[in-house]
Amino acid sequence: MFSKLDAVESRYEEVNMALQRPDIASNQTQYRALMKELGNLEKIVLVYRDYRKKTENLKASKELLTAEQDAEMRELIREEVKELEAELPDLEQQLKIALIPKDPNDDKNTILEIRAGAGGDEAALFADELFRGYVHYASTQGWKVEMISFSEGNAGGAKEIIASITGDSVFSKMKYESGVHRVQRVPKTEAAGRIHTSTVTVAVIPEVEVSEIKIPMSDVRIETMRSQGSGGQSVNRTESAVRVVHLPTGIDVKCQEGKSQSTNRERAFQILYAKLQQIEDEKARKEASDVRLEQIGTGDRSERIRTYNFPQTRITDHRIGLTIHQLDQVMSGSFELLIDPLIANFQAEALKKQVSA
């Protein structure tokens, strides 16, 4: 472990030196990439240096304790030794976690897609509620949510919502939300008080840079139309809404929330790029023999990941067998109650894998 940490520290120093060079400073793309790398390395290096310093202090304190004759001083030194011995295991655990291979998409912004599944109107209502919960959660994380497309349900709610979430390490947390979310509750229109079950599908896709993927324009069909509001009525006299269809795959993307056609066209292509990259990533994952060890669930939109039982205010995450009775808090934005245990479980499994290797 320590040889790896030494290598990380060496790379940190290299990047720091490179950022001082005029040729790097004048190349904004390279400069931003190195600054991002420096930030990631610094998190590890600071903990490593703290660990190293406290290890040295512990050794010195133990030597001092052996040589010290004064009873009062010996007691003070013992307290210092006790504190250091209590702190070091936690720092060592932090370092082990920091060395877990990182998902290359973790730092990326995301495209969030929520679609009503089985359950008709009730599914559409929950899709909208789930999105609002994510918006509140994003706010607590300092992220920005921007609506891309919204299709209203027949009785309110949403048949489909597409939004972008931008900020610090969005995908690293939101990726755990991909899959089928099942809701159990009594609809307001249900006179007999029977519990209905409905589903909502969530897809979280990492955004990609335009330069990362190339699409021949002959493979794309672009259509323009007027933006539609509630009930399908036109809300724009100009054809600002844009639909982009990728002919080889059949991927169909529509954007209408932007004020101009150019804005909607740009966003539509960003979503298309992200979806095409996701297809490539899924192919690569299927070829890997240890996919299930490297992630919690497949992230596949057909996988049932969670059940929300409103009568019992209970949420169960089926991937790790987690059950909590804090449904109201979660739907108000406290998704960390679910996401943080998922991250901790992933880290524990990854550490087991490192030990067995």
UniProtKB/Swiss-Prot annotation:
Subcellular location: Cytoplasm
Modified positions (N5-methylglutamine) in chain numbering: 233
A cellular component annotation (GO) from this entry: cytoplasm
Alphabetized InterPro entries for the sequence: PCRF, Pep_chain_release_fac_I, Pep_chain_release_fac_I_sf, Prokaryotic/Mito_RF, RF-1
Membrane-traversing stretches: none
Domain of life: Bacteria
One function term, GO molecular function aspect: translation release factor activity, codon specific
Modification after translation: Methylated by PrmC. Methylation increases the termination efficiency of RF1.
UniProt-listed Gene3D superfamilies: 3.30.160.20, 3.30.70.1660, 6.10.140.1950
Entry keyword set: Cytoplasm, Methylation, Protein biosynthesis
Function: Peptide chain release factor 1 directs the termination of translation in response to the peptide chain termination codons UAG and UAA.
Family: Belongs to the prokaryotic/mitochondrial release factor family.
Name the record gives this protein: Peptide chain release factor 1
The species this protein was found in: Bdellovibrio bacteriovorus (strain ATCC 15356 / DSM 50701 / NCIMB 9529 / HD100)
